[in-house]
Amino acid sequence: FPRYPALAPAVAFWTDVFGRQSEHTSVVHVARTPQIVLARLHFDAGLPAAQRREQERAALSQMQQRLERLHDDLVAGASLDAESKALLARFGTTANPQMVKAAATDLRTQRGVRERTAHAMEVSGHFLPMMEATFERHALPVALTRLPFIESSFNLEAYSKVGAAGLWQFMPATARHYMRLDEAVDDRRDPWMATDGAARHLADDYALLKDWPLAITAYNHGRNGIRRGLEKTGGKNLLDLIERYDNPRFGSASRNFYA
């Protein structure tokens, strides 16, 4: 798969999230440029989830206010204190007031998943030989079998808040095209059936888009959504979409899925 130099900072960010950042930490960062990390939060292991979410929301609100003040100071030409200078430095040498203003309304938190990734590394050996054989049978790159590290951490019981289920996190509507899903049977929970479905799904994505970065992103965003984005922007590749496509549905998850 192509390694775009423009995505290298985002790849480094997600490598840190999955490989080094503990589940007891979160970072406040800019959604469109995830490598711009503005704050790090640390939580006690026993802190209830509701309290953690409350602290994350408070951190986002506080950071938005800090960025708005920083923007105003930059526009006014005011001298910056040490804290403001340190915050501005997070944006790099090309920082400007417009960049700071845009970031103020484009913040999100990201929790670490190091422990989940480590557990996934342990259990994935039960499934990867079967997955690799399935993808080889469909003439697909076997590296695609690592997508469940991102999708579900190889958790058979994974179920998202929007209804995606299983190792491959199939949404119900998509699953019905590739496996059995009805009141009696949910093949999304079956690693063998779901893997075959994922292989056919990715093969269909590639057949339509003729480009692996786009096809992989389509697994998250939907192939028709990717095609509409290309048509709207006149883009030819994933970088064009990331840079030009302004659509609420093409959010942080879709923009960062390939990275």
Please place each PLM-identified region on the residue numbering.
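An acidic, Gly/Ser/Thr/Pro-rich helix-cap/linker signature
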Residues: 1-138
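Extracytoplasmic
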Residues: 82-88, 102-104, 139-145, 149, ...
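Substrate-binding clefts and substrate-entry loops adjacent to catalytic sites
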Residues: 107-118, 154-164, 168-214, 234-248
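Short helix/loop segments within enzyme catalytic domains
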Residues: 206, 210-223, 227-229
